Amino acid sequence: MFRINRFQELLKFLPRSSFEGMVARHKADKHSKGFGCWDQLVAMLYAQLSGASSLRVLEAGFNSQRRHHYHLGVRAIKRTTLADANARRDPAVFEEAVRTLVAGVARSVRQQSQHLMYLLDSSPIALRGREFDHWTQDNKTGHTQGLKLHVLLNAHDQTPQWHSITAPNVNDLTEGQKVPIEPGARYVFDKGYCDYSWWHRIEQAQAFFVTRFKRNAKLHVVHSAPVSQADASWLISDEQVCLSNKHPRGGRINPYDKPLRRVIVRRQGYATALVLATNDLSSPASEIAQHYKQRWAIELFFKWIKQHLKIKRFLGRSANAVRLQILTALMAYLLLSLLNRAQGGKKTLWLLLAEVRESLFDRLQPDQAWSQRRRRHQQELLENQATLFG
């Protein structure tokens, strides 16, 4: 009896029929010359999951598994053909594939958690050297030459919900304002995203935010809540405040005329306190502080993908090839997250990646395959019920 391998198991979360629909919409295979977007996707995901360090290693490793190519729907690859596709092919199909996987993860998260909290941040991706300089020099900053990856992370399961790839000189706030706002959700970000007009839009969308006031914020206190003796060791003050500056920047009118909340907390090991800003006027101060503390999860996410997936050493040197490789890293992370959830979520993502890396072309054992199908069927039933009754 035929049994699928681990690689096929992962790809089931992005069915080829769905992917080919994306390819058709973008007419991405128009000049493919026998090496289509699906071949490119499988090859690049193999590079991410196997940890291939170069195109030569990718070609040798992937082509050594020829008996599995038919069931993956691909043929042996040539590194020159893959390099050419990475340099020239529009990444729009891969962008849409990431969004499709994000939607699949988001549906599952909504069933598991009533309270949505998102973490927003960016991380630089350094690209230096003669082969990168011709397209990275003009947009470099004092700290970074390369690109910047912006991510909105779901705090419940540390999966990306939105992303953007820009030059490093693009302001975080400029990209942050493109994030879709969900009513009832909570958005946590640092003071680099300080913009009262944007805060007002989040408030108008009936969502919440937790961030930090800048040092020069002009505020006047409307109400001070008493600090209990039990909280005095960490909480300095809990106040409702209003913004005093009606023209904060460039003569623009500040639209945020409602009270905000300022929670000032001590930081262990630091001389300065943390001055938090939020439009949540009812939650305990301890919860507000804890929400901001969870922002570190997105720092760990960036550290994880840079350490364990391929976004520090690149297989191509063009802007297009680098962007495609970052997108396939995000796809690999999302596929691993979906597989982990289908298996009950008992393993760390690092342990699962280590197992996948060592057994990428191993056939699943019969009991494994059966239990995977059963769990996936149960997950589909839950999703259908949520669609019907939600």
Regions found by a protein language model. Name each.
Residues 54-72:
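DNA-recognition alpha helix
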Residues 1-57, 87-89, 112-116, 120-131, ...:
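Single, function-defining residue in the core of a domain
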